[in-house]
Amino acid sequence: MSEDAPKILGPLDVRRVMAALPHRYPLLLVDRVEELVVDERITAIKAVTINENFFQGHFPGRPIMPGVLIVEAMAQAAGVLAVESLGLAGSGKLVYFMTIDEVKFRTPVEPGVLLRLEVAFAQKRGSVCKFEGKAYIGDKLAAQANFTAMIADPPTD
């Protein structure tokens, strides 16, 4: 293997995801990572079940995952990508999202599906990273968004 070959990680279980992200129930929206190519991209999975608390009110009789949570799931996948790529695990640094652009919702996300989150770095400059994200159900595009985040220390009291 050449030194220029990308470093590929995966699959990574939820314990590794939780080591990278500060999110916990009910807002941890990445269940596992299928593949992570350091400094490039990530493919992660969110298993969407009827037991999700948001389905109680969104919508009774026609449960659909809120679009904002689909975007949050993509953002969390991007957070794992950033933490693993930049060697931030255990550093205490957090990934703070600054902008979300060009969000498009293509198809409803209903209980019983595996939502595949594909996120790639679009640009890295200092502590600021830009990402392109897509969420799929099978081969069908459910949502897409571009977002920008910065890596920073958590706020102090």
Curated annotation (Swiss-Prot):
The active site is at H58. It holds the Pfam family FabA. One of its GO terms (molecular function) is (3R)-hydroxyacyl-[acyl-carrier-protein] dehydratase activity. InterPro entries: FabA_FabZ, FabZ, HotDog_dom_sf. GO terms for biological process: fatty acid biosynthetic process; lipid A biosynthetic process. Involved in unsaturated fatty acids biosynthesis. Catalyzes the dehydration of short chain beta-hydroxyacyl-ACPs and long chain saturated and unsaturated beta-hydroxyacyl-ACPs. PANTHER family: 3-HYDROXYACYL-[ACYL-CARRIER-PROTEIN] DEHYDRATASE. It is found in: Cytoplasm. It is an enzyme of class 4 (lyase). The gene is fabZ. Keywords: Cytoplasm, Lipid A biosynthesis, Lipid biosynthesis, Lipid metabolism, Lyase. It catalyses: a (3R)-hydroxyacyl-[ACP] = a (2E)-enoyl-[ACP] + H2O. This is 3-hydroxyacyl-[acyl-carrier-protein] dehydratase FabZ. The keyword Endoplasmic reticulum does not apply. One of its GO terms (cellular component) is cytoplasm. Its EC number is 4.2.1.59. Belongs to the thioester dehydratase family. FabZ subfamily.
